[in-house]
């Protein structure tokens, strides 16, 4: 409904929660041991290198009370641990099973079966920030409500997907936008 296109630009972006979960899933795929030992990830040799903006950290907590992914052990019986996977935007750890860890000459992180209870944190937001607070902090930028296609290349790290959403101006939704590429 009267959606407009945007010219090419670099702006802050806020993804709706379900889309942010999908992006986090793509990160886990790229940082998984299977992708790494097959050399099918752009994160090979990525430890201790910047990956995200400096305000982003990602924690894993397999012991989170009542967490959907909580458990004392992974699918191989290896005890997991609470850890920072990304700290200040820097990649600090991979998601390794016993098998993938051996193939890489590393130690299992207790991630046979995947990641457990990931928490994305940002120094630019607070845990009690609601949607409106996040829009205010975004200021002027793009709120993405839909992603189209599967334009993710895990080997190179290239990411190109169609998107639509809303242009945000001064912390308020201003205009619908469509036919944009991220």
Q: PLM features: residue spans?
A:
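Dual-mode signal for accessory low-complexity, basic/Gly-rich regions
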Residues: 6, 30-31, 44-182
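Mature, solvent-exposed C-terminal subdomains and processed small-chain segments of exported/organellar
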Residues: 31-41
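Internal alpha/beta scaffold segment
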Residues: 1-27, 31
């Amino acid at each position: 409904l009267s959606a407009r296109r945007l010219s090419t630009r670099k702006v802050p972006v806020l993804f709706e929660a379900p889309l942010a979960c999908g992006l986090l899933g793509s990160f886990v795929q790229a940082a998984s041991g299977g992708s790494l030992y097959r050399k099918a990830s752009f994160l090979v040799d990525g430890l201790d290198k910047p990956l995200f903006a400096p305000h982003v950290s990602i924690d894993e907590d397999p012991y989170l009370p009542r967490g959907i992914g909580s458990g004392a052990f992974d699918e191989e019986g290896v005890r997991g641990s609470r850890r920072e996977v990304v700290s200040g935007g820097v990649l600090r750890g991979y998601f390794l099973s016993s098998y993938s860890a051996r193939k890489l000459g590393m130690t299992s992180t207790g991630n046979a079966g995947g990641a457990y209870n990931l928490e994305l944190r940002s120094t630019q937001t607070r845990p009690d920030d609601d949607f409106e607070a996040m829009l205010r902090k975004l200021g002027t930028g793009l709120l993405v409500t839909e992603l189209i296609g599967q334009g993710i290349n895990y080997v190179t790290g290239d990411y190109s997907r169609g998107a639509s959403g809303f242009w945000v101006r001064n912390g308020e939704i201003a205009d619908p936008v469509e036919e944009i590429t991220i």
